[in-house]
Regions:
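ATP-dependent carboxylate-amine ligase catalytic core
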Residues: 2-17, 23-111, 119-146, 155-158
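Internal gly/pro-rich beta-alpha loop/helix module
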Residues: 125-236
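C-terminal and late-domain segments of enzyme folds
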Residues: 108, 238-239, 252-265, 269-271, ...
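Phosphate-binding active sites in nucleotide-utilizing proteins
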Residues: 240-317
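Beta-strand->loop->alpha-helix junctions that form or flank phosphate-binding loops
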Residues: 37-38, 172-180, 269-277
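Acyltransferase
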Residues: 195-240, 248-252, 419-450
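A short, charged/proline- and glycine-enriched loop
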Residues: 1-2, 237-243
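Cysteine-nucleophile active-site neighborhood
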Residues: 295-374
Length: 450
């Protein structure tokens, strides 16, 4: 089985571009690849999904123990001929930027994957070898097995490849040229989502064409051939006992594939709906999940869907088990100011008014602790979470305590009760008791309302 992790020395080096190019080329070659993302990012897996037509999974060593990550990787790789992991940020950048824990290197080390380093040789030649030498020798083993040049001309590749191979003792496996016609734009939370990129499939095809032409496939495939990961014994998915409505559209698109799988494994049927377009919730539901996304970019359309706003408010107030993260939390507030500064009424079950803070707010990983029992949490428990948002609310809640793992910054957040969780923190549900608790609350609600 072909297995590797793509990494770089920094963000913005073209990891996502290279990942999509290689995935598409592997797909053309009949390898039936699957994809993974190191860390908590939601957007890059959307591009993997656009290439493959199947889910891409997140593997995060802050969210999950090593054995859980290995199991998630094996489960996702089962039945595929290639598994491609995309790293996050710089190769060794982990918690707080001062630790290698939860870094791309940590993931490669945990899974035993060869690493292909994506390098953009802008304004450098021999100095590039010195920098790469530092990356290779910073940790032992580094797992770095090869180099891929990005935004590189054929002429520069001919010059750099033999020099880097001589200095580093590592193979240069090819390059991608600059492709202005295949550029994917970005905004305040990173890249545009895959659904928003015009002519995405044509851009992906251009990337794959370039990869076919300029990558040394025989060497890459030979270098990255490994035994498939061992799949732990998987319990059978139980029959669905309750329906959970999950918001999914352009405004609410930040849901981990593993979370939805965990809902199903807990006995729930996942039923998607669009807060932008559907005028009512799905019928006979026992729970409601509102993930994050970009509601601030669609505030007017969300606000004008008044029949759905009214129904969600009524159902939550009548006890419908509900979990709302980040953008979902904003949706449940009193109002949401859009990117143009216009304020729009929202569901109104929470007191806060939200607007652009003009900066990243409480960015990064944290541990979320509960003081008392509620639908999802038990007193004294702590769960890993992350926050990633520019919008903030006048009422973020005070029910839970959040604390960063590095530096110790702490704050109160979230609103909870026996049928409710809402807050800025994104939860990672897989491998925790949270899906079972949510499904149980949904079953109880359904039983009381049938």
């Amino acid at each position: 089985m072909i297995q590797f992790l793509l990494a770089a020395s920094r963000s913005g080096s073209g990891k996502t571009t290279m990942t999509c190019a290689l995935l598409m080329a592997l797909k053309r070659r009949g390898c039936e690849p699957c994809a993974f993302k190191s860390g908590p990012d939601y957007i890059d897996p959307m591009f993997h999904r656009a290439v493959l037509g199947v889910e891409s999974r997140n593997l995060d060593l802050f969210f999950s123990a090593p054995e859980t990550v290995r199991a998630l990787y094996a489960k996702g790789a089962a039945g595929h001929g290639a598994a491609v992991c995309e790293g996050a940020m710089g190769f060794y950048d982990g918690l707080g930027g001062v630790s290698d824990r939860a870094s791309a290197w940590h993931l490669a080390d945990t899974l035993g994957l060869p690493v292909l380093l994506v390098v953009e040789p802008k304004g450098q030649s021999l100095t590039l070898a010195a920098e790469l030498n530092g990356l290779v020798n910073f940790r032992t083993p580094s797992h770095i097995a090869g180099i891929l040049l990005n935004n590189c001309t054929a002429r520069m590749h001919v010059l750099l490849a033999p020099m880097l191979e001589k200095e580093m003792g590592l193979p240069v496996l090819g390059f991608l040229p600059k492709l202005p016609e295949a550029v994917i734009g970005s905004r305040h939370l990173g890249l545009y989502t895959a659904a928003e990129v015009e002519n995405l499939q044509q851009k992906l095809a251009l990337l794959a064409d370039a990869a076919e032409e300029h990558i040394d496939w025989p060497r890459l495939l030979a270098l990255c051939e490994k035994e498939p990961p061992v799949l732990p014994v998987q319990p059978e998915t139980p029959p669905a006992r309750v329906r959970i409505a999950v918001a999914q559209d352009e405004a609410f698109c930040f849901a981990y594939a593993e979370t939805l799988e965990a809902f199903r494994d807990a006995g729930a049927e996942v039923v998607f709906f669009s807060p932008l377009r559907d005028t009512a919730l799905p019928e006979n539901i026992g729970g409601l999940y509102l993930p994050g996304g970009y509601p601030e970019l669609h505030a007017r359309e969300l606000s004008e869907n008044t029949s759905l706003l009214r129904e969600i408010k009524q159902k939550i107030e009548s006890g419908l088990p509900t979990a709302a993260e980040c953008g979902g939390f904003l949706y449940l507030g009193q109002s949401l100011t859009d990117a143009e500064g216009q304020s729009w009424p929202m569901v109104g079950v929470l007191p806060g008014k939200a607007k652009d803070a003009g900066r990243l707010v409480r960015f990064g990983y944290a541990a979320l602790s509960a003081d008392s029992d509620s639908m999802l949490f038990r007193a004294g428990e702590s769960f890993p979470i992350h926050e990633f948002h520019h919008w903030d609310s006048t009422a973020n809640g005070t029910a839970l305590a959040a604390k960063k793992p590095v530096g110790g910054a702490a704050w109160r957040c979230g609103s909870v009760n026996e049928h409710f969780y809402a807050g800025f923190p994104h939860l990672y549900w897989a491998g925790t008791p949270l899906p079972q608790r949510f499904a149980a609350a949904a079953e109880n609600y359904r039983r009381d309302h049938d």
